[in-house]
Amino acid sequence: YYLLRGIPSYEDGDFSTEKFEARYNADLANNLGNLVSRVAVLIEKLFNGSFAYSRKYVLKEVDDKVINTWKKYIESLDNFKLHLALENVFSLADFANLFVDEHKPWALGDNPEHLNEVMTNLIVILLNVAWLLKPFLPETSNRIFEVLGADKDGKSWEEKPFQVRPKILFPKIQ
């Protein structure tokens, strides 16, 4: 991951243990791992571990962000700019973390409609992040699907509730 994310294709790069640990902690532990954990724990606490996803709750802002991310991702892959493809994936994860902070789902217990909307949008983002990561981090992608209790093929996401299994994906390197 570090080499793909941190060093542009066809260019020289610099590797150090310190840079590796910093990238791992920033991208994987703090950003992605924390996001997956936050969403799973929220579903566990607010929905007793089972969440029924519904496409009707997906916001245009989120839909546009996901579509735009896929377009940039594919363009980056077409141009062999793997570091930019991963940058787009983590930009989507950043967006989701800001979405959590902005909408504060833990405080929406008295507004179930808005809570469903917020959690649906977070699920949509995480499912797309998992798919986007598949070529680069296939095990991580599978673990995200597993934590969310989502089918890896995406065929039945709206047919049955997600059964979350919260766990830490990336422990921090100290």
PLM regions and their residue ranges:
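Residues that form generic nucleotide/phosphate-binding pockets
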Residues: 2, 23, 65, 69, ...
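Generic structural concept
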Residues: 29, 33, 63, 67, ...
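Catalytic adenosine-cofactor/nucleotide-binding cores of aminoacyl-tRNA synthetases and other
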Residues: 1-57, 150-170
